[in-house]
From Swiss-Prot:
Protein name per Swiss-Prot or TrEMBL: Transcription-repair-coupling factor
GO cellular component, one term: cytoplasm
Gene Ontology biological process: regulation of DNA-templated transcription; transcription-coupled nucleotide-excision repair, DNA damage recognition
A single GO molecular function term of this UniProt record: RNA polymerase core enzyme binding
GN (gene name): mfd
S-S bridge residues: none
Source species: Bacillus subtilis (strain 168)
Entry keyword set: ATP-binding, Cytoplasm, DNA damage, DNA repair, DNA-binding, Helicase, Hydrolase, Nucleotide-binding
Organism superkingdom: Bacteria
Length: 1177
């Protein structure tokens, strides 16, 4: 927005600051500006001086806002945010990697000599970092043609925070497989694969972490640290020495033996972890021991950097608060015997600033003296925030009149092209003339403009006669930005949950549930093969050859339930399977009957979209996700058909289901039909009512609400309106199902969370459903597999992508302590937010709420639990929703439904006792707005955790690191979804055979009834040849990857797929050995054999025999087959067995490669030996 900056640059105030910089003044103060006006001033300084700028704010939230502004204003400069959580205790907790990746990116860019604009909260400056030279020496440049010693590289990677794994799927991991090294730098979008020829780097390629395939070839790669803690051998030795002397000094200060014992045990444990080479977060507390002189972030910035302190008095207040919190935190750790007495955790911000040689510029809203500052130049700018118009255009028109009289230049900003056009038409409606312009064109004094651009807030600068108005002031709702691309996209795409781990339960289709013990290579009659080793009841074991891998599935049942192992060869599994089969057949019958009824019934076919519909949709202030757009398209297509719609729309709370439903409602109202939206609770009704009222405000649509919050008079008016057709859309609880509610012409029924209505209500819903279009919304994920099997029974649309929001929820797993809770709550309240405190024990929830009130006396604390009456619960929730209470202590009832964007901190008590899926859903309750949200999963101090709880906490830790926890959560939710869809009684059946087998059985039963069985049966060839065809341990070590590859071999259906798999294996694992080559040969044989319907390829003592199916044999021309065989001389024998052709190929005295060539040659040639069919003309 260069043209807005020009106004600032031409002012005397700006020139005064620039002169001060030229004259070498150490400190200057700029007062009077706030919000985005400050950002415009900063961007003008950046452009004018062309110097790097380091801007410090009081907290992270403010730093984000400033970063967003500067990114919009400075298109040609890189603006970086250095995000640090202000809570000192969270520093040493296990934390999510996204913010760390951003911090590392900033440090790497600074050490590589870039001169960006960096924005950081004061907490970032207090933080200790490795000295700059240590960081620089930790950068590794790897180039093609250079030599690398894999073991040395592995040691260095571990020193700088990387973790070794079997397969690289998340940032911060590396793996070494023979001459192939995969590394996922934290600051790269994709991981890299380095291939060695002996020790020389032969090639470097980036690859996709999902399918592990290469993307592009590189000539070099710079690998920076994966953590901010770098521990080389010399640092380790220094720290060990200091820990020993610190421990001796601390033990002297303690009186009680018990205390000494605890301290000694804890510190010894830390030393052990340090000597093992661990670099986890908990060792961060020893940072001052590792380095002679730790660095601050400012030490990394170029010498000519201009330092700006944004609202300097607030920064000093925050510094005091941080010092106080840190002192309390250290006191707590000292009491617990977890820290030494002389440890420093951070720098003093004031001291660092005082030591700076660089020029300082202070921003302050008011002109006043601030402690610790002595500015030599003070500039007071006349400026004010733009007032909010909240859609009241008559107020804006009055303001515009004032601007015109004073000869102001006015700029309206719209987020994108569509928004600027919308702005133009809105202003024209109120006779406000505005010219379209862009940020490069000069502005003429006294004119009104519309321009594409985004700022956090508008402002007015009276002396410069400039006013900037954003959509934030014009309309109530803020337009969401398209975020800057996150670096961690690939890590979030998580592999299918069906991957097998050793110790998992599995289901064999013929033998039942067993425990998977790994993959083993066995030698039988001199032939090597890989087998899955499955343990059954007692000491029974089953070895399943990998070619039968599709008969084994991972067992997925309800979370926390251990399945029973079956006895091999027993009849119990057959009995259980039979029972489930019968139940599945019944369900399939019901579903097919339902399907036939739906197809036969006649409804109303809505007309295609018209201009008004398109206009209504373009007024949506956010960016739709692809899933939203697809769902909208599917729903409209259904509505335009004559058959009544029955569609389920699935998506988590806050994923944008409501907007999809609103568009469907608008379409129905456009055709003169009425719409009813049925919701389970009064609060949800209220929320939907507010949303719909706001979305429909520019259209002549009459909206009714029927709930406990309406007076009798209001309710009667709505009921009357529904009967005579004056009410177009009604939102209501089960009150809508009462006998007195009659519609003139209902066209669309929208049901939110149908599973939360009781049986009697569901019956009434069925009656209304009969001939109207029905859209059901649910937040419980419905499994895709089940959806496939139910295709055509109930249509399903799924919204799986969350709305684009810049910051993922920062998740911490940490011991519970009062100081942490107080800090987290106070921090959230300080930024105007609210807190969920999850406490899952109804009996003493009141006591817990009182405890929190005592911890944070300023907070208004409320509590809610499931044993309250519906009315009590709704009253509490409503007052929380309206901001009358700050902290809600609640049981898991907050899992569902109500969306409160202002809640951005979640604290979970006893997280180890909760299901992963619950934790995942709870975590989804925060982080709905454009702020960083925090989730603290706490467990009780010094509690011995059960093995299950420990595993669960481990999984939560993994899922803070974007690991597999997400998959487990989705899996459990999926099962719940299945239960909801099919009825609760199915839960037991799903558990008894596992979810995947159940889905498969249901799918087959439905296809059988639809007559689709012929389509699903594929011709299978059985191949039994004596070849060492397997994946040796030396080629792929990891069992999971082996299984994955065997599955891929099994699914090869064409020669193209075989070739692709060959390329992929060479790409991922290097050149393959003979044993793997034989696997490819067998796969190729199978492709041709299937095409020519060869039933069996079997090797006996001296030949390989091919048996061709009866139908295929009948099509073969004997003469042509004889000629084909002659090409191979005496090695081929031909004969018939009944009506089936048999071909035998000699193996005696020939190498495997020779007879394989002949087998392949004969199989390929079969397509050319068919009888000619003479077409009749």
């Amino acid at each position: 927005m260069d043209n807005i900056q020009t106004f600032i640059k031409e002012s005397d105030d700006f020139k005064s600051i620039i002169n001060g910089l030229h004259e070498g003044l150490k400190e200057q103060l700029l007062a009077g500006l706030s919000g985005s006006a400050r950002s415009v001033f900063t961007s003008a300084l950046a452009n004018e001086t062309n110097k790097p700028i380091f801007l410090i704010t009081h907290n992270l939230y403010q730093a984000q806002k400033v970063t967003d502004d500067l990114t919009s204003l400075l298109e040609d400069r890189s603006v970086l945010l250095y995000p640090v959580n202000e809570l000192i205790s969270s520093e040493i907790a296990v934390a999510s990697p996204e913010l760390r990746a951003q911090r590392l990116d900033v440090i790497n860019r600074l050490t590589n000599g870039e001169a960006p604009i960096v924005v950081a909260p004061v907490a970032a400056i207090r933080r200790m970092l490795p000295p700059v030279e240590v960081w620089k020496s930790s950068q590794m440049l790897i180039q093609v043609g250079h030599d690398i010693e894999p073991d040395q590289l592995a040691s260095r990677l571990v020193e700088v925070g990387y973790e070794r794994s079997d397969m690289v799927s998340a940032p911060g991991e590396f793996s070494i497989r023979g001459g192939i090294i995969d590394i996922y730098p934290l600051t790269s979008e994709n991981p890299v694969r380095i291939e060695l020829f002996d020790t020389e780097v032969d090639s470097i390629r980036s690859f996709n972490s999902d399918d592990q395939r290469s993307i592009e070839t590189l000539t070099s790669i710079n690998i920076g640290p994966a953590k901010e803690l770098i521990i080389r051998p010399e640092e380790k030795a220094r720290a060990m020495e200091k820990i020993d002397s610190g421990l001796a000094a601390s033990l002297k200060k303690l009186k009680a033996d018990k205390q000494k014992e605890i301290l000694h045990a804890n510190i010894s444990h830390d030393k052990e972890r340090l000597s093992e080479g661990q670099t986890d977060q908990e060792l961060v507390k020893y940072l001052s021991y590792f380095y002679e002189k730790p660095a601050s972030l400012l030490d990394y910035t170029p010498d000519n950097t201009l330092l700006i302190l944004d609202e300097v008095s607030r920064i000093h207040e925050m510094e005091e608060q941080l010092q106080k919190e840190e002192a309390e935190f250290i006191t707590n750790l000292l009491e617990e015997g977890k820290i030494l007495h002389d440890i420093r955790l951070s720098f003093s911000f004031q001291k660092i600033v005082a030591e700076q040689k660089r020029p300082l510029l202070y921003y302050s809203l008011f002109l006043r003296h601030v402690h610790h500052t002595s500015p030599q130049n003070i500039v007071n700018v006349s400026g004010r925030q733009m007032q909010s118009f909240h859609g009241q255009m008559n107020v804006l028109a009055g303001e515009m009149e004032r601007f015109k009289k004073s000869n102001f230049t006015v700029v309206f900003l719209g987020a994108n092209k569509e928004r600027t056009q919308k702005l133009s038409s809105v202003l024209a409606d109120y006779d406000i003339e505005a010219a379209m312009t862009d940020s490069k064109k000069a502005l003429v004094q006294g004119q009104v403009y519309i321009m594409e651009g985004e700022l956090q807030s508008g402002f007015e600068l009276p002396l410069m006669k400039l006013a900037v108005i954003t959509e934030e002031e014009l309309f109530k709702n803020r337009v969401k930005k398209k975020p800057r691309k996150q670096k961690l996209t690939n890590a979030e795409r998580i592999k299918s949950y069906s991957e097998l781990q050793i110790g998992d339960y599995v289901v064999h289709i013929n033998h039942g549930i067993g425990k998977y013990l790994g993959i083993e290579t066995l030698e039988i009659n001199g032939i090597h093969k890989d087998y899955l080793n499955i343990h059954y009841q007692g000491s029974d074991k089953l070895y399943v050859p990998v070619e039968q891998i599709d008969q084994v599935q991972k067992y997925v049942g309800s979370e926390g339930k251990e399945p029973k192992l079956y006895k091999l060869g027993g009849s119990e599994w057959k009995r259980v399977k039979k029972k489930v089969e019968t139940s599945v057949q019944d369900i399939a019958d019901d579903l097919i009957k339902l399907y036939a009824e739906r197809e036969a019934s006649k409804g109303y076919a809505f007309s295609p979209d018209h201009e008004m519909q398109r206009e209504f949709e373009s007024a949506f202030p956010y960016q739709e996700t692809e899933d939203q757009l697809r769902s909208i398209h599917e729903i409209k297509k259904d509505m335009e058909r004559e058959r009544p719609m029955d569609r389920l729309l699935c998506g988590d709370v806050g994923y944008g289901k409501t907007e999809v439903a609103i568009r469907a409602a608008f379409k129905a109202i456009g055709d003169g039909k009425q719409v009813a939206l049925l919701v389970p609770t009064t609060i949800l009704a209220q929320q939907h009512y507010e949303t719909i009222k706001e979305r429909f405000q520019d259209y002549p649509i009459n909206i009714g609400l029927l709930s406990r919050f309406r007076t009798r008079k209001e309710a009667n008016e709505t009921i009357k309106g529904l009967k005579n057709g004056t009410v177009d859309i009604v939102i209501g609880t089960h009150r809508l199902l009462s006998k007195d509610v009659v519609y003139k012409d209902l066209g669309l029924l929208i049901i939110d969370e149908e599973q939360r209505f009781g049986v009697t209500h569901k019956e009434k819903i069925k009656q209304i459903k009969a001939n109207v279009d029905v859209l059901t919304l649910t937040a419980t994920p419905i499994p895709r597999t089940l959806h496939m099997s139910m295709l055509g029974v109930r249509d399903l649309s799924v919204i799986e992508t969350p709305p684009e929001n810049r910051f993922p929820v920062q998740t911490y797993v940490v011991e519970y302590n009062g100081a942490l809770v107080r800090e987290a709550i106070e921090r959230e309240l300080a930024r105007g937010g609210q807190v969920y405190f999850l406490y899952n024990r109804v009996e003493d929830i009141e006591r817990k709420a009182d405890e929190i009130s005592m911890l944070v006396p300023d907070a208004k604390v409320a509590y809610a639990h499931g044993k309250m009456t519906e009315n009590e619960l709704e009253t509490v929730m409503l007052s929380f929703l309206e901001g009358e209470s700050d902290v809600l202590v609640s049981t898991t009832i907050i899992e569902t439904g109500v969306d409160i964007p202002n809640v951005n901190t979640l604290i979970v008590f006893d997280a180890d006792k909760m299901g992963l899926s619950q934790l995942y859903q709870l975590r989804g309750r925060v982080g709905r707005s454009n702020r960083v949200a925090y989730a603290y999963f706490t467990y009780r101090r010094d509690k011995v955790l059960t093995e299950v709880a420990e595993k669960r906490l481990q999984a939560i830790k993994e899922f803070t690191e974007l690991g597999s926890g997400f998959k487990i959560a989705m899996r459990d939710l999926t099962i719940r979804g299945a239960g909801n869809l099919l009825g609760a009684q199915q839960h037991g059946f799903i558990d008894s055979v596992g979810f995947d087998l159940y889905s498969q059985m249901l799918k087959e039963a439905i296809e059988e009834r639809k007559g689709d069985t012929a389509k699903t049966e594929q011709f299978e060839t059985e191949i039994d040849v004596e070849l060492d065809a397997y994946i040796p341990e030396t080629y792929i070590q990891d069992g999971k990857q082996k299984i994955d590859m065997y599955k891929r071999f099994r699914s090869v259906a064409t020669i193209e797929e075989k070739n692709e798999l060959q390329d992929e294996m060479i790409d991922r694992f290097g050149n393959y050995p003979k044993e793997v080559e034989y696997l490819f040969t067998v796969a190729e044989m199978k492709v041709y054999a299937r095409q020519e319907r060869v039933e069996l390829i079997k090797q006996d003592k001296d030949a390989v025999r091919l048996t061709i199916s009866e139908e295929a044999s009948a099509e073969i021309d004997g003469q042509k087959l004889f000629e084909l065989g002659n090409q191979y001389g005496r090695q081929i024998g031909l004969g018939m067995e009944g009506k089936k052709l048999k071909i035998s190929i000699q193996t005696k005295g020939r190498s495997a490669d020779e007879w394989l060539d002949t087998v392949l040659g004969m199989l390929k040639g079969l397509k050319d030996v068919k009888k000619q069919t003479i077409s009749s003309t």
